């Protein structure tokens, strides 16, 4: 049993025995003792004063005496203005370390048949361009959130919805037909998603040229600049051709459908390479080309049930004014669907495929209103998780030189970013890696991959997802400070210490004796290790990968300070050496498990 649980149970018993009243567990408030006071944990007595009918100091004294006598975890206590500072017994610390040591998955809850099923949607790419920096943040958040939810005892299904239809897809298709000359990814020596992205940019270039000429013509005919611009954007031959192609696609034109399938397959192959490089994946992928018709059918069912209204122009709307919102378009007057319709269709397919208890959408904060509306609509349509769906909303990510726009071809490409991070990691870690005995070029490359990706992932995930962030590649690959490489290097350092101990024929016991020597820094490290279970649980409640990232940094920082102050292999006594090796071993274990929740690998040496 954890120290906090022992003390909480004993404190509840103390209140009942001393004051004749049972109080709820939430009344026992424990916190870490301030560094300027003696003790390890502090019990706040103020919530108990109505029960004790005594002054805070007297209440603290009563409970302190009871705990010292009746709770093995408490060795001593002192009272400061109603705060009961508890000194934890030596045996409790070693017992706690033994519990942590015995559990390879310490801090995580097991998944059982009865566990709730959580589905997490992330990535959601368009098939007209490669993945970019914004997708990187999305994918890393989604993957990490899935690991965190599973570590909290949930069954998790990772899912992706691919936006594979619509006018933007037709733009790339039309550009390929006009200017592609039959080019393929193989002929171009390019990933398919990059090739299709080039044609999307090419369409935009020619479209702007057409608009510019038409706008000039309309202005000469007497229109204002704004009127001329708007008309040009609707009347440009290219956009009309793209709309005609979309109509043909929706009417299942075999030639257009064949082209669409071929080009989309090129893109999917490219996406798969990027996902593999990032270390993310999915259990189930949905495609909007399959879900939008399901959504239309679901909306029409809702219309029949009186949930929605049809206006005079034949469009279908949801009236949300009773929720303090406006009316929301669900079907256009020509019967075509909008994004909301597609999301309803996707929800219907998922609901039929899996008995979902909770649905989490990892989507940027520009869609906050969309998901507020979707939640209401799904609830009205009878999805049990609709009202409580979670929109895991995150902010924009930028590089120091500004925002990204894929139409202009200035997008920060995910593949290029990953490749450059690995190259930079290899350069910056060269001095450290070259000192390793018997290191091969293959091992050097693998260490560079682990460190480069670790730097990228950690830098992005350590930031509160709700905030906009600036990703600085140079700052991320630093072996000091709050970075992935700093944590990875500390892990590798501990593994090196443990290998040296093994080479010296030092065998660690499965558990320490109650009287194993422990100084205050060692107790603090054991407490920090114990905090991992709290960090995991809180990250599950808050949907917060940054909570795990910052815990890993705090643990690493605390261990490095300890390692600076105390020798491990050259400790004064054999008992101290064994204790410190046991602590170091478990710090490495928790670092590895914590970083795994972020999707980050740690190298055994570097």
Across the structure, where does each feature detected by a protein language model lie?
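Flexible, low-complexity linker/hinge segments
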Residues: 101-113
């Amino acid at each position: 049993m954890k120290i906090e649980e022992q003390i909480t149970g004993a404190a509840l018993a103390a209140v009942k025995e001393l004051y004749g009243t049972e109080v709820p567990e939430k009344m026992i408030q424990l916190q870490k003792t301030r560094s300027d006071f003696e003790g390890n944990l502090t019990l706040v007595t103020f919530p108990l004063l109505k029960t004790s009918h005594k002054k805070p100091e007297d209440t603290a004294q009563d409970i302190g005496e009871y705990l010292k006598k009746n709770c093995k975890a408490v060795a001593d206590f002192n009272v400061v203005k109603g705060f009961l500072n508890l000194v934890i017994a030596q045996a409790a610390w070693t017992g706690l370390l033994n519990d942590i040591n015995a559990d390879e998955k310490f801090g995580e809850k097991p998944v059982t048949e009865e566990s709730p099923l959580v589905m997490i949607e992330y990535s959601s790419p368009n098939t007209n361009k490669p993945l970019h920096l914004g997708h990187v943040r999305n994918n890393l958040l989604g993957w990490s959130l899935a690991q965190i939810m599973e570590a909290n005892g949930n069954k998790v299904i990772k899912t992706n919805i691919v936006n594979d239809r619509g006018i933007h897809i037709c733009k790339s298709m039309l550009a390929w037909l006009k200017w592609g000359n039959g080019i393929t990814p193989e002929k171009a020596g390019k990933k398919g998603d990059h090739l299709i992205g080039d044609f999307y940019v090419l369409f935009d270039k020619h479209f702007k040229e057409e608009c510019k000429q038409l706008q000039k013509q309309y202005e000469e005919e007497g229109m204002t600049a704004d009127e001329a611009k708007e008309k040009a954007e609707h009347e440009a031959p290219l956009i009309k051709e793209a709309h005609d192609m979309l109509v043909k696609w929706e009417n299942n034109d075999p030639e257009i459908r064949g082209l669409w399938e071929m080009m989309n397959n090129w893109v999917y192959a490219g996406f798969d390479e990027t996902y593999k490089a990032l270390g993310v994946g999915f259990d189930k992928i949905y495609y909007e080309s399959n879900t939008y018709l399901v959504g239309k059918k679901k909306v029409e069912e809702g219309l029949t049930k009186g949930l929605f209204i049809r206006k005079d122009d034949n469009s279908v709307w949801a009236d949300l004014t009773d929720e303090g919102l406006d009316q929301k378009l669900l079907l256009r007057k020509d019967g075509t669907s909008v994004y909301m319709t597609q999301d309803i269709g996707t929800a219907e397919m998922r609901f039929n495929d899996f008995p979902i208890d909770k649905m989490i959408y990892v989507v940027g904060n520009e869609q906050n209103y969309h998901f507020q509306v979707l939640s209401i609509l799904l609830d009205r349509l009878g999805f049990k998780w609709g009202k409580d769906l979670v929109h895991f909303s995150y902010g924009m990510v930028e590089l120091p030189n500004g925002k990204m726009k894929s139409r202009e071809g200035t997008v920060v490409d995910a593949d290029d970013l990953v490749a450059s991070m690995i190259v930079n990691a290899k350069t910056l870690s060269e001095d450290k890696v070259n000192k390793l005995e018997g290191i091969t070029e293959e091992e050097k490359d693998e260490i560079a991959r682990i460190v480069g990706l670790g730097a990228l992932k950690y830098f992005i995930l350590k930031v509160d997802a709700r905030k906009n962030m600036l990703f600085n590649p140079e700052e991320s690959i630093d072996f000091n400070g709050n970075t992935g490489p700093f944590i990875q290097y500390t892990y590798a350092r501990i593994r090196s210490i443990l290998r040296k101990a093994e080479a010296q024929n030092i065998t660690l016991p499965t558990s320490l004796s109650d009287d194993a020597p422990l100084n205050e820094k060692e107790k603090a490290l054991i407490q920090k290790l114990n905090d991992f279970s709290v960090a995991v649980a809180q990250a599950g409640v808050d949907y917060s990968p940054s909570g795990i990232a910052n815990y890993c940094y705090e643990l690493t920082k605390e261990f490095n300070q300890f390692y600076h102050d105390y020798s491990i292999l050259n400790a004064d006594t054999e008992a101290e050496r064994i204790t410190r090796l046991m602590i170091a071993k478990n710090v490495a274990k928790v670092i590895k498990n914590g970083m795994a929740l972020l999707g980050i690998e740690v190298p055994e040496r570097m």
